[in-house]
């Protein structure tokens, strides 16, 4: 696979490769961007988010359908991001705080978005409700100052591993705060970031730009580094 570069988002550095908690595989940085909200005419940045995909598995899987597409084509196509979310390869998401958040603030917002999406799609059951409760429980005792990180490993069988870091590193052998077996939740957490109504359009643009380069390199056998994608709000 072609080499990839690091990405810096608001002073937060996402290295080109990570080995996430709960995984035996290296993951490459697919893209990164801010998550923010418009408040009284000002764009307030809350978190920097990096999305990593399993080396040796993600690019060949995505190439079957998306090889030859430009960055703009990928960025505009909800089906591309759906394939990233549901693809048969591991994903790893690192959420690093720009502003402080409590665990309850973060997990309440994520589960609220997930439950709303499930109910709208008619797929909400007691199993999803129980998974959302486990997710909130894992976050309850934690608070996240600027620079602290939340680490999600999304496995193809549908296990969401949750871990925490006091900084932007991914600690070797990090102990998971929770491993939640629920495919809907495992996919929904990532979908809430890069899906059709994802909270980080900047991360989506970055992923589209970088993955289109990697797909091009895969098809031509080129090993040049993926171009660093501009990451703006």
Swiss-Prot record:
Pathway: Secondary metabolite biosynthesis; flavonoid biosynthesis
Keywords for the protein's UniProt record, in alphabetical order: Flavonoid biosynthesis, Isomerase
Domain of life from the UniProt record: Eukaryota
PANTHER family in UniProt: CHALCONE--FLAVANONE ISOMERASE 1-RELATED (PTHR28039:SF8), CHALCONE--FLAVONONE ISOMERASE 1-RELATED (PTHR28039)
Catalytic reaction list: a chalcone = a flavanone
Protein name, as recorded: Chalcone--flavanone isomerase
Function: Catalyzes the intramolecular cyclization of bicyclic chalcones into tricyclic (S)-flavanones. Responsible for the isomerization of 4,2',4',6'-tetrahydroxychalcone (also termed chalcone) into naringenin.
Site label Important for catalytic activity, positions: 106
Entry GO MF terms: chalcone isomerase activity
Residues where substrate binds: 47, 113, 192
EC number, as in UniProt: 5.5.1.6
Gene3D superfamilies: 1.10.890.20, 3.50.70.10
Gene: CHI
Note: Part of the biosynthetic pathway for all classes of flavonoids, a large class of secondary plant metabolites, many of which are brightly colored.
InterPro entries, per database record: CFI, Chalcone_isomerase, Chalcone_isomerase_3-sand, Chalcone_isomerase_bundle_sf, Chalcone_isomerase_sf
A Pfam family the protein falls into: Chalcone
GO terms, biological process: flavonoid biosynthetic process
Family: Belongs to the chalcone isomerase family.
